[in-house]
Amino acid sequence: MPIPKNRPMHVEEEVSSQTNTEILLFALVIILSVIFINFFFFYLCRCCVYFYHTLENQEGDDERPLIQHHMVNRSTGSLSPSVDRLGNVLGYDIPSRRRRSVVSKEALSCISLEIPYIKWLKKRKGHAKGESTFLDNRSENQSVIVQGQGETPSVIITYDVRRPNLGSTSFVEMSSALSNIYNTDASDGDSSDDSCLLEDEEDFCIICYADYAFDDILRVLPCEHVFHTQCIDTWMTTMKASCPLCNEDYYKYFLQMDAASSVTHENAAWSIPLSPGDSRTHSAETDRSLLSAMSVRNSRMPYIVSSTL
C-alpha cells in the first residue's frame, strides 16, 4: 500500500519531544541521586568521626598504646597533617583533648637531668647514707624506710615496681630488701664505695623493660624517677608529657617555655643554669617561666643537682 506523500509530520514531532523530555527527567534524577548519596556519605563520615573521638575520650590513658608514632607529629607534637586535613574536610573540629600534651626535646632538657647509670648509683647510695628526703604523696611507687645509722637515723626513699607489697612488710624485711638492692648490709656504715658499682637487679626502665647497664644514659625527672634517655624522650615528645610511673604532669611547665624558646631560638633553652654551680646564666630575653621550671627541678632533685654531673 503506497504511503501518501502528503502525510502530516506532527505525530513524529510529538514522539521526538516526548523522548527528549524523558531523557532530561532521567538525567535530572541521576544528578539528584548522586548529590544525595554524596551528602549521605559526608554526614555518615562526620558522625563516625564524632562518635570515634567521643568513645576514645571516655577511655583511660592506660588503654591507649604505649607510644603512638602514626598519630603524632614528632616536631610539633600535634596530630598528623592527614588527620587535621580530614577534620577540615569533614567540617569537624578535633577536640583539643585529643591533641597530645607533648613537649620538645630541648624543653625537656631544661627541667630534667641526664646522668650515666654508674653515677646515678653512686649518688643514690650516697643520698641513702647521708641525706634525708621526704616522700611525695602523689607517687604510688615509693616507700619510706627509716634506717638507723649510729645515733642519727636517716629517712630514705626507695622505688619499688616489681614488688608493690614492700611497704606492708616489717621493718626487718624492708631493711633486708634495701640491703639487697644496694648490695651492702644496712647496719654497715663503713662499707666500701665500690659496692655501689654493682648493677642493681631491680633497676630497669619501666618503658622498655630493659635492665640498666653501666654505660646507659638515664634521664632523671623532677619526681626522681629515672628512665633511659631515649625511652623517656620518645614518651614525652610523642605520647604525653608526664611521668610514666607517677603520672605527674609536666606539660604545664612547658606551656610558656616552648613559646619563649621559639622567640630566642634553641639557645634560649640552654641559657638557663643546669645546676647551682653552673657558669651559664639565664638570658634576659627568656621568659620567667623557664626560671620557675628550673626552680621546680632543683627543689625536687636536691641530691642530684647538688654536685656537678
From Swiss-Prot:
<keyword id="KW-0469">Meiosis</keyword>
<dbReference type="GO" id="GO:0051321">
    <property type="term" value="P:meiotic cell cycle"/>
</dbReference>
<keyword id="KW-0863">Zinc-finger</keyword>
<dbReference type="InterPro" id="IPR013083">
    <property type="entry name" value="Znf_RING/FYVE/PHD"/>
</dbReference>
<dbReference type="InterPro" id="IPR011016">
    <property type="entry name" value="Znf_RING-CH"/>
</dbReference>
<keyword id="KW-0479">Metal-binding</keyword>
<keyword id="KW-0812">Transmembrane</keyword>
<dbReference type="GO" id="GO:0061630">
    <property type="term" value="F:ubiquitin protein ligase activity"/>
</dbReference>
<dbReference type="InterPro" id="IPR051653">
    <property type="entry name" value="E3_ligase_sorting_rcpt"/>
</dbReference>
<keyword id="KW-0472">Membrane</keyword>
<dbReference type="InterPro" id="IPR042981">
    <property type="entry name" value="RNF11_RING-H2"/>
</dbReference>
<feature type="transmembrane region" description="Helical">
    <location>
        <begin position="23"/>
        <end position="43"/>
    </location>
</feature>
<keyword id="KW-0862">Zinc</keyword>
<dbReference type="GO" id="GO:0008270">
    <property type="term" value="F:zinc ion binding"/>
</dbReference>
<keyword id="KW-1133">Transmembrane helix</keyword>
<protein>
    <recommendedName>
        <fullName>RING finger protein mug145</fullName>
    </recommendedName>
</protein>
<dbReference type="GO" id="GO:0005737">
    <property type="term" value="C:cytoplasm"/>
</dbReference>
<dbReference type="InterPro" id="IPR001841">
    <property type="entry name" value="Znf_RING"/>
</dbReference>
<feature type="zinc finger region" description="RING-type; atypical">
    <location>
        <begin position="205"/>
        <end position="247"/>
    </location>
</feature>
<dbReference type="Pfam" id="PF13639">
    <property type="entry name" value="zf-RING_2"/>
</dbReference>
<dbReference type="GO" id="GO:0005789">
    <property type="term" value="C:endoplasmic reticulum membrane"/>
</dbReference>
<comment type="function">
    <text>Has a role in meiosis.</text>
</comment>
<dbReference type="GO" id="GO:0006511">
    <property type="term" value="P:ubiquitin-dependent protein catabolic process"/>
</dbReference>
